[in-house]
């Protein structure tokens, strides 16, 4: 029997039966909860409001309570929290009082990975898509991985799945440095950029050092898959004391993309390999940034034994990830309709990648964007970059900053961005009341426009409302 055919038996976490998640509806929490529930643990959790995610968990037998109360942790042997959960939370306090272990989400993910052959995907941008593509290729190759992803994989309808092999593919989160808990066999680094700098005391060198520390969690026989097109990753390469597979458009990449051609939502390119014949592939996602994400997935999957046919099928059949260039359908308004795309990107580099993909795939169409800045600190730190990138759209409507629990910062809000953009010759429309949005869109849009809802806050929910109000898929 081949090694890939062996069902990997996961040892029980000793003495642990009941596992309680505080904030179980969070994108980083629900996937781990789902995998553990499918392994047979008694999972419970709480959150502050209902959501489709909670309904899915309940369908798996998970007990979910709305609101945080001490009695919610009854029956728990361990309590799992995320960085979004306050240490004064009633359930966390009750766990400490009862001497029940309280562990961060990343530590529980690390425990899942410890019993498997872990593939961890790190980087400031592209983690979710790269993790999803890796899982898709490995599934096509019959490797049947468990995966935990920071977004909904459209083909699976969920962000996590318990596979029957020894493989676990998961995102590695640098935002709070929690990826240092992970000890994978293989690791991808897509890029390193200035974001979540409060975690690193505003010190970029500390961020770089933390990525090196993460890579050195690999065993000496592990492999680091790194994007040499990213200047920071290239700078870090000499410090990596592990085997490295380099990927990118650069001539010195071990896995290189060339002959890139975009046809709407489909991107065609050739994979040139240091060993083996070139491979022509088609990816069901637009943009050169997604070509890089695909190269990383190809590199790590091939290293684990995925063949060319599985790679071709995995990319060609890929149906995308929720809120990652997610085409919602046609939005109808007085005067015509616009194609509505929803995208999670909230860093200037991510917004620029979305704009570039649209310009490449839909040349000649006007680009209208409804943008919601995410966090006042990010808006302040990357203010000029946001102004530069947003000035590249044809029509811009802007919502107020999604605070994510932060206090407002003077001069780092949506009105300030609008003022700065007007100096660039763009006339952005500040949306002070989302209830007025339909009327504002009707006044700004033209028939045939491409409308993007962009950001990490509740703008994704607004996109769904627009589709419902404006005629849905058509």
UniProtKB/Swiss-Prot annotation:
One of its GO terms (biological process) is cell division. The gene is murC. It is an enzyme of class 6 (ligase). GO terms for cellular component: cytoplasm. Pathway: Cell wall biogenesis; peptidoglycan biosynthesis. ATP binds at residues 123-129. Belongs to the MurCDEF family. Keywords: ATP-binding, Cell cycle, Cell division, Cell shape, Cell wall biogenesis/degradation, Cytoplasm, Ligase, Nucleotide-binding, Peptidoglycan synthesis. Its EC number is 6.3.2.8. The keyword Cell division applies. SUPFAM superfamilies: MurCD N-terminal domain, MurD-like peptide ligases, catalytic domain, MurD-like peptide ligases, peptide-binding domain. This is UDP-N-acetylmuramate--L-alanine ligase. It is found in: Cytoplasm. GO terms for molecular function: ATP binding; UDP-N-acetylmuramate-L-alanine ligase activity. Its main location: cytoplasm. It comes from Alcanivorax borkumensis (strain ATCC 700651 / DSM 11573 / NCIMB 13689 / SK2). It catalyses: UDP-N-acetyl-alpha-D-muramate + L-alanine + ATP = UDP-N-acetyl-alpha-D-muramoyl-L-alanine + ADP + phosphate + H(+). The keyword Cell division applies.
